[in-house]
UniProtKB/Swiss-Prot annotation:
Induction: Up-regulated during myogenic differentiation in a p38 MAPK-dependent manner. Up-regulated in response to fibroblast growth factor FGF4 in embryonic stem cells (ESCs) in a p38 MAPK-dependent manner. Up-regulated during high sodium diet-fed in the renal tubules. Up-regulated upon hypertonic stress condition with raffinose (at protein level). Up-regulated by parathyroid hormone (PTH) in calvarial osteoblasts. Up-regulated in response to adrenocorticotropic hormone (ACTH). Up-regulated in response to cAMP. Down-regulated by bone morphogenetic protein BMP2 treatment in calvarial osteoblasts. Keywords: Cytoplasm, Developmental protein, DNA-binding, Metal-binding, mRNA processing, mRNA transport, Nucleus, Phosphoprotein, Repeat, Ribonucleoprotein, RNA-binding, Transport, Ubl conjugation, Zinc, Zinc-finger. Phosphorylated. Phosphorylated by RPS6KA1 at Ser-334 upon phorbol 12-myristate 13-acetate (PMA) treatment; this phosphorylation results in dissociation of the CCR4-NOT deadenylase complex and induces p38 MAPK-mediated stabilization of the low-density lipoprotein receptor LDLR mRNA. Phosphorylated by protein kinase AKT1 at Ser-92 and Ser-203 in response to insulin; these phosphorylations stabilize ZFP36L1, increase the association with 14-3-3 proteins and mediate ARE-containing mRNA stabilization. AKT1-mediated phosphorylation at Ser-92 does not impair ARE-containing RNA-binding. Ubiquitinated. Ubiquitination leads to proteasomal degradation, a process inhibited by phosphorylations at Ser-90, Ser-92 and Ser-203. Associates with the cytoplasmic CCR4-NOT deadenylase and RNA exosome complexes to trigger ARE-containing mRNA deadenylation and decay processes. Interacts with CNOT1. Interacts (via N-terminus) with CNOT6. Interacts with CNOT7; this interaction is inhibited in response to phorbol 12-myristate 13-acetate (PMA) treatment in a p38 MAPK-dependent manner. Interacts with DCP1A. Interacts (via N-terminus) with DCP2. Interacts (via N-terminus) with EXOSC2. Interacts with XRN1. Interacts (via phosphorylated form) with YWHAB; this interaction occurs in a protein kinase AKT1-dependent manner. It is found in: Nucleus; Cytoplasm; Cytoplasmic granule; Cytoplasm, P-body. SMART domains: ZnF_C3H1. The modification Phosphoserine is found at S54, S90, S92, S203, S318, S334. This is mRNA decay activator protein ZFP36L1. GO terms for cellular component: cytoplasm; cytosol; nucleus; P-body; ribonucleoprotein complex. It comes from the Eukaryota. InterPro entries: Tis11B_N, ZFP36-like, Znf_CCCH, Znf_CCCH_sf.
Amino acid sequence: MTTTLVSATIFDLSEVLCKGNKMLNYSTPSAGGCLLDRKAVGTPAGGGFPRRHSVTLPSSKFHQNQLLSSLKGEPAPSLSSRDSRFRDRSFSEGGERLLPTQKQPGSGQVNSSRYKTELCRPFEENGACKYGDKCQFAHGIHELRSLTRHPKYKTELCRTFHTIGFCPYGPRCHFIHNAEERRALAGGRDLSADRPRLQHSFSFAGFPSAAATAAATGLLDSPTSITPPPILSADDLLGSPTLPDGTNNPFAFSSQELASLFAPSMGLPGGGSPTTFLFRPMSESPHMFDSPPSPQDSLSDHEGYLSSSSSSHSGSDSPTLDNSRRLPIFSRLSISDD
């Protein structure tokens, strides 16, 4: 009986020494240590005395796996990051998990779209703010930023305000509450509408755009009017004070240049001036406005139409027909009848 007690005491002593060695050096595990670990889990000792205080080391399971892998001939697994984490006792696992989350807000701060868009009230009233440079409001006009609004901002009435007379958003509401906001919006629209627009003084052909605009507006104002605009002669256009000099206007051409440009395409004689041909009345243009030949029975109608058109063009001229002012087609037809 005495021998059994002595052997149990020696066994406990050796187990404590083995645990101390393992705590100092984890790199040299032994098979005996694994057996002692199994005893430490809760198995009874040799004399049948159960251990009251059993301690489970975090690396005991790792040593068991390493022993089994060595017996099977497999390479021993290396220490994982989780097992090596318990070696460092400077901070716990929970502190390590909270450490990166505490660094994130300080590293990068995401500002809202309203950052520094309003003045700081404590700074304006007292001249100081407890937040300092970290304040979300502007400390002075130089820090104030312009707020980007939606295109439909303050363009519709606030239904809540005009229904119950109260809006929880107050001045931050995106809809119109009173007439002052409507007037402010209208003033902003007037400023945007008063911006100067690009105006082209002359078109490519050299005609003033103001005259064309006036003619277009005149036609739009009187849509039932069929009176054509007055035909301007070349001398009137060239002598108009609205036209710039030839040196300043890159699209100004002389009569000789116009003759060289339009003579091949229009079949004009070399000595004739194209400007006088271009601005001749319709009744005096022999080749451009020739009508197709018509039957003999409709000559009276055409002559009547010719007389009415010539009287409307001449104005104060007599309604009698002149053979020199008649179109060539009617002249030929009258000659054939004779």
